[in-house]
Amino acid sequence: GFNVDLNNQKVCDGMNIHAAGVEKTYLNYRFSQPYRVSTQHSERFIPDVNFPRQYSVRVNPFLKFPDGILKKPAFDPYIFHTDTSTQYWQSRASLVSSSEGGTMDFSESSRVRKFLISGAESYNRFNSLAHNGYGERQCFFPSNNLHIGALMRALFSNLEEWVADGELPLDSIYPKIYDETLVEASSMFLPSLIKENFRAALNGSGDMEFGSRVKFNRGVVDLLAPEVIANHKVLVPAVDQFGHDIAGMETHGMESDI
């Protein structure tokens, strides 16, 4: 089971799950490859976003059985789930907290806090330089070199106090459907500089049929080119007049005047 060792003891009291979005490790499958994640242009046919997608237990809307990531209260850790803007566009992070149809927010386990780090990539080295990709001609805009280390250090300290001392942590800070901070990409308000050259492409998602031996976590993939049986509506954070995600935590670099 998740977070249980061979002596039936809890392994981790707390975890910081970073830059995952809704994607899970491709593990506990025959011939699995734990380092694989699906992107817009590679690894399309792996079961990394199939149910469950939330920490709390809920009923699978397609197969009608309950499942969740945290389902063993005696062994469940405290979790800080941190995503950046990249995870909403690439790793379908909206599905961690909202329905597959993009119509409603889900409440979350009391053992979980979720945070969006606004305007950032997954991670960057301190003092890294922006670039336009390979040969400086791969990307229209320069890459994002925002460093999030200081903010992550503060969050990790808060998680440690929760685990070690029992002090209640920060409330979750992430975009939601109900307050219109989580929206469809096609309806975003964007600054004119970005809007003129932006194609609003994001990584799609859907429940896929890998064969009967994948259902109920049995772990054998029979259909190597699976059929999408139900598409998901992937949403993204609404942005302000500067193009920064509204409902997230801003680093000191974003808060400084230029």
Please give the residue ranges for each predicted region.
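C-terminal His-loop and adjacent cap/lid subdomain of alpha/beta-hydrolase
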Residues: G1-I258
